[in-house]
Swiss-Prot record:
This is Flagellar biosynthetic protein FliP. It is found in: Cell membrane; Bacterial flagellum basal body. The chain crosses the membrane at residues 7-27, 53-73, 97-117, 194-214, 232-252. GO terms for cellular component: bacterial-type flagellum basal body; plasma membrane. Keywords: Bacterial flagellum, Bacterial flagellum biogenesis, Bacterial flagellum protein export, Cell membrane, Membrane, Protein transport, Transmembrane, Transmembrane helix, Transport. One of its GO terms (biological process) is bacterial-type flagellum-dependent swarming motility. PROSITE patterns: FLIP_1, FLIP_2. It comes from the Bacteria. The keyword Transmembrane applies. It comes from Pseudomonas aeruginosa (strain ATCC 15692 / DSM 22644 / CIP 104116 / JCM 14847 / LMG 12228 / 1C / PRS 101 / PAO1). Belongs to the FliP/MopC/SpaP family.
Length: 255
């Protein structure tokens, strides 16, 4: 069984776990157990099922922020948006298409990281081999490694200095409250650098078309109308989508 299949099975089991108690609770409202926290023989805290469900439902509200700020999604969606502007297309591809493509490309890029989280943290927790707190700590390790690999040292040092923390001995010990903004800042810089390189060939086409129209005295004709077919043709001839998607996926170094 592959890690991805096991992850899908784990999510399905989690959904069944969340839905199963509701008929019984509706039949007997007094059977709802109190939220309890107990300490086992090893000194570790264990949470009741009710508290675990509450924590899971609370964590679900942070999924959009997690996807946007702790994965490759930010760089990918910004590059796609700049590409659409460079082509001169205001609404094609639509926002829904760009976001969907960015999400699936993010899943592809982050698959090695998610596989490590599944094998090192999620599966041991679901098998009751480790407590929830230890599972969260183990899940942070591959995620931090990914973000540190994409974060510039100058950006990380900036936020460490702003936080006035002096107890951080190594980049791996950086807390997420400092690492995440540093990672996002680096991702924005990288996305704009890639976007600048994408703009150059299309900008040259716009300048050439504008110069030709000016020489012909057709100043009332918008250069965008004439240059748009040439830009689309150039993008198709060089297999632009495969080139950009392949470059984006390879820029993270995880695939």
């Amino acid at each position: 069984m592959t890690p991805r299949i096991s992850l899908a099975g784990a999510l399905a089991a989690l959904c069944l776990l969340l839905l199963a108690p509701w008929p019984a609770l509706a039949a007997d409202p007094t059977s709802i157990s109190a939220i309890t926290v107990t300490t086992n023989g090893q000194g570790q805290q264990e949470y009741s099922v009710s508290l675990q469900i509450l924590l899971i439902m609370t964590a679900l509200s942070f999924i959009p922020a997690f996807v946007m700020l702790m994965t490759s999604f930010t760089r990918i969606i910004i590059v796609f948006s700049i590409l659409r502007q460079a082509l001169g297309l205001q609404s094609t591809p639509s926002n829904q298409v760009l976001v969907g493509l960015a999400l699936f490309l993010t899943m592809f890029v982050m698959a090695p990281v998610f596989d490590k989280i599944n094998s090192q943290a999620l599966q041991p927790y679901l098998n009751e081999q480790i407590p929830a707190q230890e599972a969260l700590q183990k899940a942070e390790v591959p995620l931090k490694a990914f973000m540190l690999a994409q974060t510039r040292t100058s950006d990380l040092e900036l936020f460490v200095r702003l936080s006035k923390r002096t107890d951080i001995g190594s980049p791996e010990a950086t807390p997420l409250t400092i690492l995440v903004p540093a990672f996002v800042t680096s991702e924005l810089k990288t996305a704009f650098q890639i976007g600048f390189m994408i703009f150059i060939p299309f900008l040259i086409i716009d300048l050439v078309v504008s110069s030709v129209l000016m020489a012909m005295g057709m100043m009332m004709l918008s250069p965008l109308i004439i240059s748009l077919p040439f830009k689309i043709m150039l993008f198709v001839l060089v297999d632009g989508w495969a080139l950009i998607i392949g470059t984006l996926a390879g820029s993270f170094g995880t695939v």
